[in-house]
């Protein structure tokens, strides 16, 4: 029997195999030029019959162009539920979004940097609290779609000297991996792997020979929001120039130092596991295909 519960205005199916906690705070973070911090939370999913054994953790990061989105979107709930069903812990996180009425190329870049900061903070939060959540810190994976994938990519690859100039004038935007309390700041950001669905990097030269994180890239070849090759984000001139999954894969292949997988889907557009992108309704068959790819990637890259 599956029950329904209202979470943040959305009806969410409750699975008897999965326990969930909603709205758990993990960080307080600032917007540029504002003194007031915002509360960032996560929803946590785990197997209902979980033992005291340490589990892998998957941290999921929603999409929405850095303009909108929520940790309780249908795909995030489904990812986390499915991972909990196979014995993992999973957490769907908040991150800072673009302030209202400030849509521009510079603001998107700045917001992308803040989102990358928040991804890093979430990873280090769970490392610092691994005993409480029974997490195997050697088996933490990241999964993001669209803007969520972009945030993960830049958290993985951006060095301090590569951060955008748009972020440097604000004391509220410290170095990428420096947010959090003292215990969290003492943790490294490193993860076991990242599953990146229809994401991009703003400069492929950020991907260096010293990268060590395995990545799984999934992308539709007809994507016009974040192209699989390269082009302006949203296909709008003046927006940030984006280098998609095929460019990133070619860069990783050229370097030859990081395990990676590239899964291209012919005739598929952006966020193709949704039936209708504007309504965020999942296509069960396409989502299941992505889940199988992600699960198999994790099994191949688990660190004991």
Give residue spans per PLM region.
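Alpha/beta-hydrolase active-site loop
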Residues: 108-131, 154
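The feature captures the conserved acid-bearing segment of alpha/beta-hydrolase catalytic domains
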Residues: 171-255
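C-terminal catalytic histidine-bearing segment of alpha/beta-hydrolase fold enzymes
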Residues: 242, 246-304
């Amino acid at each position: 029997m599956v029950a329904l519960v209202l979470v943040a205005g959305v009806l969410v199916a409750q699975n008897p195999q999965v326990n969930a906690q909603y709205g758990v705070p993990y960080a307080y973070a600032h917007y540029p030029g504002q003194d007031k911090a915002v509360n960032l939370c996560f929803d946590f999913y785990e197997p209902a019959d979980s033992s005291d054994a340490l589990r892998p953790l998957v941290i999921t990061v929603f999409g929405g162009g850095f303009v909108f989105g929520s940790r309780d979107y249908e795909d995030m709930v489904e990812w986390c539920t499915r991972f909990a069903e196979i014995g993992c812990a999973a957490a769907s996180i908040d991150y800072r979004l673009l302030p209202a009425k400030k849509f521009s190329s510079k603001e998107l870049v700045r917001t992308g940097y803040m989102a990358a900061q928040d991804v890093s903070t979430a990873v280090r939060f769970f490392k610092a609290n691994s005993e409480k959540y029974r997490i195997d810190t050697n088996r933490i994976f990241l999964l993001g779609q669209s803007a969520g994938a972009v945030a993960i990519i830049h958290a993985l690859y951006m060095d301090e000297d590569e951060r955008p100039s748009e972020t440097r004038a604000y004391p509220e935007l410290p170095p990428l991996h420096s947010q959090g309390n003292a215990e969290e700041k003492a943790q490294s950001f490193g993860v076991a792997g990242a599953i990146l669905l229809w994401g991009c990097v703003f400069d492929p030269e950020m991907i260096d020979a010293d990268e060590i994180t395995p990545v799984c890239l999934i992308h539709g070849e007809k994507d016009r929001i974040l192209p699989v090759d390269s082009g302006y984000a949203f296909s709008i001139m003046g927006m940030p120039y984006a280098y998609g999954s095929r460019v990133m894969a070619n860069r990783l292949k050229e370097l030859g130092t990081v395990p990676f997988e590239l899964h291209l889907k012919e005739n598929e557009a952006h966020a193709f596991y949704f039936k209708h992108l504007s309504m965020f309704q999942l296509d069960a068959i396409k989502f299941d295909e992505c889940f199988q790819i992600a699960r198999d990637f994790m099994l191949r890259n688990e660190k004991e």
